[in-house]
Design a protein with these regions (language model features):
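Glycine- and acidic-residue-biased ligand/ion/polar-headgroup-sensing regions
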Residues: 49-68
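Short, surface-exposed secondary-structure edge patches
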Residues: 33, 53, 74-76
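Double-stranded beta-helix
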Residues: 3-9, 13-14, 70, 95-125
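Short acidic-glycine-tyrosine-enriched beta hairpin
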Residues: 67-89
Length: 125
């Protein structure tokens, strides 16, 4: 069996809150680095299919989520080394308290699987 090695540059996608560096997005998994500017946030949103996990590599973040059983909103501070798993259907939002980076691993990503609950800095203007 021949082993194929693929070396490539990540795809950088500018966002209102910073940028996404797509490491890989294939039928099995997706890996990204989310680079945030201080004070910026992405939309409160959820995915029906995607299951994702974040690792805070740099900076600190205000993490907001909604309990879908009670409709209660919650928030917590995330610091370097914290890990959060977002299961499908869980509304969530990140806001950068300072410049920061989050490594995200997930199942395959499709833009059509993002459902916005509240606007973020990428939807303003």
């Amino acid at each position: 069996m021949k082993t194929e090695v693929l070396i490539h540059q990540g795809c950088i996608i500018p966002k209102g809150w910073g940028e996404e560096i797509i490491i890989e997005n294939n039928e099995l998994y997706c890996g990204k680095v989310l680079v945030f500017k201080k004070g910026c946030k992405f939309s409160m949103h959820y995915h029906m299919i995607k299951d994702e996990c974040w690792y805070v590599e740099e900076g600190s973040f205000l993490y907001r989520w909604i309990d879908t059983e009670t409709a209660d909103a919650h928030e917590s501070i995330l610091d370097i080394g914290d890990i959060v798993r977002q299961r499908p259907g869980q509304p969530h939002q990140l806001e950068a308290i300072e410049d920061g980076r989050i490594f995200e691993v997930s199942t395959h990503h499709e833009d059509s699987d993002s459902y916005r609950v509240q606007k973020g800095d990428g939807q303003n203007g």
